[in-house]
C-alpha cells in the first residue's frame, strides 16, 4: 500500500480523548488498565491511523503565514466538496450556494430542528441510536420517539416501515433524523429502502435530517446512496450533513458541512445557526478539508476501506470461533461492530458492566452499548492497525470471554 496503516502511533499527551481519558469520565470512558497492560482504544469513534499527508501539508502551509484574521471561505473549499461528492457519490447539480459550513454534524441537527419544530415536539430516530443524537436532541428540548431496527433472517438490520408509519402518525411527528450509513449498526442502506422511507416521510410531511458523516467508510460490495438522490421530493425536504472529520480522522479540527437544495429550508436553517455565531468556520479547518479532498485523499480512503475490511473480517471471524454466545450483524460500512452479548451474559451469570470492566482492566477499551439502546451490547472500534486488533482479540479471549 502507498499509505501507512500499520504503524502504532503514540497519542498520549497529544489531545486524545481515546487514550488520555481512561478512568476520567465515569460512565463513558473505560477504567484505567491494570499495570502491565497498555491501552488499546476501541471506543471513541476516531481512528488510530495517521491522516492523509496532504491535510498536514495544507495546514502547515497556511499556518506559516503569521496572520489569522477574519476571512471568507475560499472558492476552492466549495470546489473540492462539489468534486468529492460527484466522484464519490455520483452527486449531480451541486452548487456552492447549496453548501454551508456546520460546526459539527450535531449542531446541524439541532439547528434544523429549531427551524422546524417546537421544544417538546417528537422527533423520530431509529434505534439502536447514536448516543450523540440522544444527548443533543433531548438537551435541545425535543422528545425522541424510537423506531427499532429489526434483524432479518440473514442477520441484516432492516427498517420497520410499518412501525415508522405508526409512530409518525400516533405522535404527530414532522421531523426525522436518519443515519446513513447507520451508526452503530454499520448498515449501508439500499436505494429501495431509502426510497420507501422517504415516501413515508413525504406522506407525513417530515423534514428529514440525514447524517451521512460515515458515507466515505463503505466496505467492498456496498455503495452509499445519498438520501437526497432518490427522488426530487427527497432532494427538497432533506438536510444532508457531511464532514471530512470521520473519513480523515479530523474530529479535533471540527468542520462539517450541510447540503440543502431547497432555498426556503436552507434559509430557515441558516437563520437559526447564524443567530448565535457558533457556526463560524475555522480557517485551519477549511484548509484541512481542502487538503483532504485532494487526489491523494481519494487514494487514501480507498486504501483505508481495504484495511478496515480486513480488520472487520479478522475480528468477526475471531468472535465466531472464540466467543460463543456473542452475536453481531457484520457491518457494511463504518468501522464499528455492535456486539450483542446477551446470550453470553446469561450463560455465564455476568452482566454487560462486568464485560466492560474486565476488558478495560486488560487494556481493551471498548464502549458500553446501552446508551446506544443496545441493552447488552458493546460497540467496538476497529480503526486501528491489524496488529492491535489481534492483540485485543487475544486479551479478550484469555482474560475476559474465556477466562479460567
Sequence positions of predicted segments:
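Hydrophobic residues in well-ordered beta-strands that form the structural core
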Residues: 125, 146, 210, 366-368
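Conserved core of the PLP fold type I
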Residues: 68-199, 216-217, 221-229, 233, ...
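N-terminal small-domain helix-loop-helix segment of the aminotransferase-like
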Residues: 2-104, 111, 295, 403-404
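PLP-dependent aminotransferase class I/II
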Residues: 237-321, 327-331
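PLP-dependent enzyme catalytic core of the Aspartate aminotransferase-like
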Residues: 347-350, 357-404
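Conserved PLP-binding catalytic core of the aspartate aminotransferase-like
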Residues: 308-309, 322-361, 378
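A short helix->loop->beta-strand "cap" motif at the edges of active sites that frequently abuts
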Residues: 142, 203-206, 235-236
